[in-house]
UniProtKB/Swiss-Prot annotation:
The gene is dnaE2-1. This is Error-prone DNA polymerase 1. GO terms for cellular component: cytoplasm. DNA polymerase involved in damage-induced mutagenesis and translesion synthesis (TLS). It is not the major replicative DNA polymerase. Its EC number is 2.7.7.7. It is an enzyme of class 2 (transferase). Its main location: cytoplasm. The keyword Membrane does not apply. GO terms for molecular function: 3'-5' exonuclease activity; DNA-directed DNA polymerase activity; nucleic acid binding. InterPro entries: DNA_pol3_alpha_NTPase_dom, DNA_pol3_finger, DnaE2, DnaE2/DnaE/PolC, DNAPol_HHH, NA-bd_OB_tRNA, PHP_dom, Pol/His_phosphatase_N. Belongs to the DNA polymerase type-C family. DnaE2 subfamily. It catalyses: DNA(n) + a 2'-deoxyribonucleoside 5'-triphosphate = DNA(n+1) + diphosphate. It is found in: Cytoplasm. PANTHER family: DNA POLYMERASE III SUBUNIT ALPHA (PTHR32294), ERROR-PRONE DNA POLYMERASE (PTHR32294:SF4).
Length: 1116
């Protein structure tokens, strides 16, 4: 470092000063080192959310860094930069920020000067000048107050505004500092590192202030000077105040705190005077006796002893005991839960009941979970029923308190869509152009914007404004927008959590989160436990309850795992897996008939193989070929007996991360810790490229062990192909058991499976409409929502013989297997806009049933608007009212009248208080009924929208999806349907799987990358699409490989064509509202006589119908 490098920047902000700072923390560190600064302090607005990233980068760069915070006050106090001198000072800063967070709504921090005075000990403080001219009197009072508390830990900051008044302002501030007896300290108050980032700073200011850049005026920075400046430039700017420069180095040297000092202390979980080690060993022994009732195998005992010894050396016993406590609580209140991820490699976790995968059955690798040579905490993920996980979360808060337990943060960052829209708005582009720009973007990626996307949005790619929008949208991507709560990562500490990291409120009541995300915690080696939510566990829990209540068959997950049936695997092999956990996507379905799973380990492979890692590593086709060869009786040849032991279970093809590690250990002489570093390098390969550092060691190590160099290089390239997508076998094994359990339930009880899936929404790949269609194809009778029969959840009704003829022909083999005897009654939860509390009141007061709309209104206590939603959902059929008649009756209720709420009139005679004359209402046409069903329920039991277009489609040569099975492979076909799902598996050569639906079922479309680029708008924007392509039939799985796509969404207007003569508008009752108005009477006469009334124009009608049809779900 040069001799003049004596300036430390202490006023820097990063993009974690949300929409103020305009550069990432890591780039600030790198630039500061390059600029020759003696040190860098980062002080973001009321937050330390970005300091761990800077800390990690500074360690890599070997550069001095200190964490702090810029305190912004709500009481008019000028901003103050606060830096901790030591560990105690850090705890005080965290307590200070926590106090401001907890008195505010999520995302805000309300600080007062009194908070700082309470927590200022061991903090160094720099009082900053505001944007205006200095106010000597108030500033002198503030400095006097602060000096009484902070003494010589207080400085007055000098930051140039570059507005022509700096010399004057500095003189005023210097005089105030001399009078107060405190030092001056120089800072450039940097918002970004490089002056070229000034335009991006203007963009984030525009977004923050909700005004376009052209109209932002003085809200924008006056110049591009707010960047990190080198020591020479700063010395020149402060040549009149050299002490202000010198004080930055003095200040920095007084800071003796490092984030590495934050040691994690897990709460002691002692029981009856036992040490944590004694408690853990006892619980493991008890669990092992239950897991192995015929005696614990010697191999298992050795593994348990090895794991317990390592856990003891690392002092992790309290962590395992805490996770065990959470699982024990969940099971005590009948919440289904199951551990997964790398923890499934552990026999200790298996014996504690945390996981349900016996590592001895799957040749798993404990070092993948915990290693004596690896200084990083273990990571245990536990899935709970997603509707009941909150009970576990509140148990944590009750047990440990918010001062000791908090959810991990998730950093919500700008992605392609949000960045494109916000930057386009900042540059003044219209909403239509904004929507066009982002509508063609797939998913929520972070790929830079291209000229092709601009052209697709109708923009001139050569226009300078367009180029700026694309450039700054690309720069803004990955910038943090705000902090949200992680899906379930919890930090639990023995000492106060708010002295380790600030805590804050979340958007949900009675929840608290910290400011750091999981990567920050990993960097600081702070332990967390993931309390995750899994919809399939909710589905299975509800399904098991229905099975016991209606069929008298109590069952558990463990019992299903032992009940291996051919019928279940037969259904899986046919890819009849809509709704089945993990294998319901089109990509998975296309694999199932080729893989032909016949046992649990086959499902482990199925879960893992349709992943980007095996695809990138060119492992899928070799594995399938070897499996087919095995079925023909051909033997697999292995390069050595040692590798056979590693790869035999996957027929010589490495599919899992654990196998990559075992190959490195067995064939290349890696130690377990080196193999784990290889695994970590695989996980970060795309971002860091560090996997190449292992290539020489692995290849040469294998050659030294007598493997051919070509084979060694091929092995390494396969492992490298995993990239960041390599799938752990332990994770796949945990999920495979749920695959089988859900498939078992669907095989034998499709009525229960459908009801449980509907009652666990939102979850899974398909919307309720497709789950209902699939259940009907399996012979399940579906009943509509009804005020006298429905509950919030879907119910099972009736009793009778199963109608085998109701099963769709393609599921004919299931007719002798299915045990269903019930119908499924749809629940109120499907009706848009209804609240569970309202529907509970309706059910509780229903008695023997409601006799009329008026009776429902009187007895339920529900508002007229709730009854309107029920009428819109056609839920009054049991009292003889169709949708239109029910809406008429609801509109007759006087919402403003209170007379019927008086106790005197709540008797039987109150129905006569308001009597409306009966009106001859025309029946609502079938197309209009379907429109309203989709608008209120997102599905219809009456008809499919495409059925109204079939006559037109047939004339155009458009086949039904049902016809594809009888069509020869290779033939050109045309199909059309509603777009249900678009799936783009990562790195699968850009292919998109589309699922479309007509009145006879679904058709599966393959869109290759070249075709997608040509028809991007049609793929991404169509609600109703026509596809021409070649039919492909592989092992009974049918696809249409698209060659041409057409957006035919406007044809949805056909659903309204038959309704026009009735003058029906968007609301079914809108043209029929009872009124004394003469114009209304004239309309009514027209309706009775069948006279034409004004209808919406063709395009408008189609747009209205399209709006209520499903958009299609996008998945990666």
């Amino acid at each position: 470092m040069s001799a003049d490098a004596v300036f430390c920047e202490l006023g820097a902000r990063t993009n974690f000063s949300f929409l103020e700072g305009a550069a990432p923390a890591e780039e600030m560190v790198v630039f500061a080192k390059k600029a020759g600064l003696a040190g860098l302090g980062i002080a973001d607005r009321n937050s330390v959310a970005g300091v761990v990233r800077a800390h990690a980068k500074a360690k890599v760069e070997g550069y001095p860094f200190q964490p702090g915070a810029r305190l912004v006050f709500a009481d008019g106090t000028p901003d103050i930069l606060a830096y901790p001198k030591n560990r105690r000072g850090w705890g005080h800063l965290c307590r200070l920020l926590s106090a401001g967070n907890l008195r505010s709504k999520k995302g805000d921090c309300t600080l007062h000067l009194a908070d700082l005075l309470e927590w200022q000990e061991e903090l160094l403080l720099i009082v900053m000048q505001g944007e205006g001219r200095p106010e000597p009197e108030s500033l002198e009072v503030l400095l006097g107050t602060l000096k009484e508390h902070a003494g010589n830990r207080l400085y007055l900051g000098l930051a140039p505004h570059y507005d022509g008044f700096d010399r004057h302002d500095f003189a005023v501030l210097a005089a105030i500092a001399r009078k107060a007896g405190i030092g001056l300290l120089a800072t450039n108050d940097a918002l970004y590192h490089d002056p070229h980032y000034r335009p991006l700073a203007d963009v984030v200011t525009s977004i923050r202030e909700h005004v376009p850049i052209a109209g932002a005026g003085f809200l924008l920075q006056k110049n591009a000077e707010r960047h990190l400046k080198g020591p020479r430039e700063m010395a020149r700017l402060f040549s009149d105040y050299p002490e202000a420069i010198a004080n930055t180095r003095k200040f920095f040297r007084e800071l003796a705190f490092s984030l590495d000092e934050l040691s994690h202390q897990y709460p002691d979980e002692n029981a009856d005077g036992e040490t944590p080690a004694e408690s853990l060993r006892r619980l493991v022994a008890e669990g092992a006796a239950e897991r192995y009732p015929e005696g614990v195998p010697e191999k298992v005992m050795r593994q348990i002893d090895y794991e317990l010894e390592l856990i003891h050396d690392k002092k992790y016993e309290p962590y395992f005991l805490t996770v065990h406590k959470l699982v024990k609580f969940a099971r005590s209140v009948n919440i289904l839960c199951q551990g997964r991820g790398s923890a499934a490699n552990s026999s200790v976790c298996f014996c504690l009941g945390i996981t349900d995968v016996d590592p001895q059955k799957f040749t798993l690798l404990f070092d993948r979970f915990l290693s004596k040579d690896r200084d990083e905490p273990p990571d245990i993920d536990v899935d709970f029923e997603h509707e009941r996980r909150e009970e576990v979360i509140q148990y944590i808060y009750r047990t440990y308190g918010k001062e000791h337990a908090g959810l991990t943060a998730a950093v919500i960052s700008y992605r392609s869509r949000s960045a494109g829209r916000e930057v386009a708005k900042a540059f003044g582009l219209s909403e239509d152009v904004q929507s066009a720009l982002v509508s063609s973007i797939w998913g929520w990626g972070t790929s830079p914007f291209t000229e092709e996307q601009a052209k697709g949005a109708g923009l001139d790619a050569a226009d300078p404004l367009t180029r700026r929008v694309l450039a700054y949208a690309s720069l803004l991507m990955n910038f943090p927008r705000h902090l949200s709560q992680h899906v379930g990562g919890f930090v639990i500490t023995r000492d106060r959590l708010d002295e380790v990291v600030p805590i804050m409120n979340t958007a949900m009541p009675d929840r608290y989160m910290i400011e750091w995300d999981k990567d920050d915690l990993d960097e600081l080696k702070i332990l967390k436990v993931d309390v995750l939510a899994l919809g399939m566990l909710t589905c299975l829990a509800k399904g098991f309850k229905l099975l016991e209540a209606h069929y008298g068959e109590p069952i558990t997950l463990a019992e299903i795992y032992q009940d291996h049936r051919d019928a279940v695997y037969d259904m899986i092999c046919r890819a009849d897996t809509v709704g089945v956990f993990q294998i319901e996507s089109r990509a998975q379905m296309s694999m199932l008939p080729r893989l032909q799973p016949r046992e649990m380990y086959d499902l482990v492979i199925e879960v893992a193989i349709v992943r980007p890692g095996p695809i990138q590593g060119n492992m899928v086709h070799p594995y399938l070929k070897r499996r087919e060869a095995q079925r023909r009786g051909e033997a697999v040849v292995y390069p050595s007996p040692e590798l056979k032991a590693v790869l035999e279970r996957t027929l010589g093809v490495p599919l899992f991360q654990e196998q990559a590690m075992q190959i490195a250990i067995t064939a290349a002489g890696f130690s377990p810790s080196e193999a784990d570093r290889l695994r970590r390098a695989m996980a970060t390969f795309k971002r860091t490229g560090t996997i190449h550092t292992f290539e020489r060691k692995m290849v040469e190590g294998m050659v030294a062990n007598d493997y051919e160099r070509e084979f060694a290089e091929r092995c390494f390239n396969q492992i490298k192909g995993f990239g960041e997508y390599g799938f752990p076998e332990s994770h796949a094994a945990s999920f495979a058991s749920l695959v089988y359990a859900s498939a078992w339930l669907k095989t034998y009880y499709p009525d229960i499976f459908c009801a449980a899936l509907l009652n666990a929404q939102p979850m899974g790949f398909y919307a309720p409409a497709q789950l209902v269609r699939d259940a009907r194809e399996h012979g399940v009778r579906m009943l509509p929502v009804d005020i006298n029969h429905s509950d919030w959840d879907a119910l099972l009704e009736g009793e009778g013989a199963f109608d085998k003829n109701a099963v769709h022909p393609r599921h004919a083999s299931m007719r002798e297997v299915i045990k269903t005897r019930k119908a499924v009654r749809l629940g109120f939860r499907l009706v848009k806009g209804l609240k569970q509390t309202d529907m509970k009141a309706l059910v509780a007061r229903r008695g023997e049933g409601y006799r009329s709309v008026h009776d429902l209104w009187l007895r339920s206590g529900l508002s007229r608007s709730v009854l309107e939603r029920l009428a819109d959902a056609d839920a009054f059929r049991s009292i003889g009212l169709d949708r239109r008649a029910a809406l008429w009756a609801v509109k007759a209720l006087d919402e403003q009248s209170a007379v019927e709420r008086l106790p005197l009139f709540e008797g039987a005679g109150s129905d006569d208080l308001q009597i409306e004359p009966k009106v001859a209402l025309p029946d609502m046409p079938a197309g209009e009924q379907v429109i309203h069903d989709y608008r209120t329920l997102t599905l219809s039991l009456k008809a499919h929208p495409v059925s109204f277009m079939r006559e037109d489609f047939s004339r155009r040569g458009i086949l039904r999806s049902r016809d594809l099975a009888a069509t020869a492979t290779g033939r050109w076909v045309t199909v059309a349907g509603l777009v249900l799902v678009r799936q783009r598996p990562g790195s699968a050569n850009g292919v998109i799987f589309m699922t479309i639906e007509d009145e006879t079922g679904i058709a599966n479309i393959i869109v290759w990358e070249k075709t997608f680029q040509k028809y991007r708008r049609q793929v991404m924007g169509s609600r109703l699409v026509k596809v021409r392509g070649r039919l492909q039939n592989q092992s009974g799985v049918i696809h249409v490989v698209a060659d041409h796509l057409e957006d035919i969404t406007p044809m949805l207007g056909l659903l309204r064509r038959e309704a026009r003569r009735f003058g029906v508008n968007d609301r079914a009752d809108g043209a029929l509202r009872p009124s004394a108005d003469a114009r209304e009477k004239k309309k009514l006469r027209q309706l009775r006589l069948g006279l034409p009334a004004r209808a919406a124009p063709e395009g408008e009608a189609a747009a209205q119908v399209a709006e209520v049809m499903p958009k299609g779900r996008n998945f990666h």
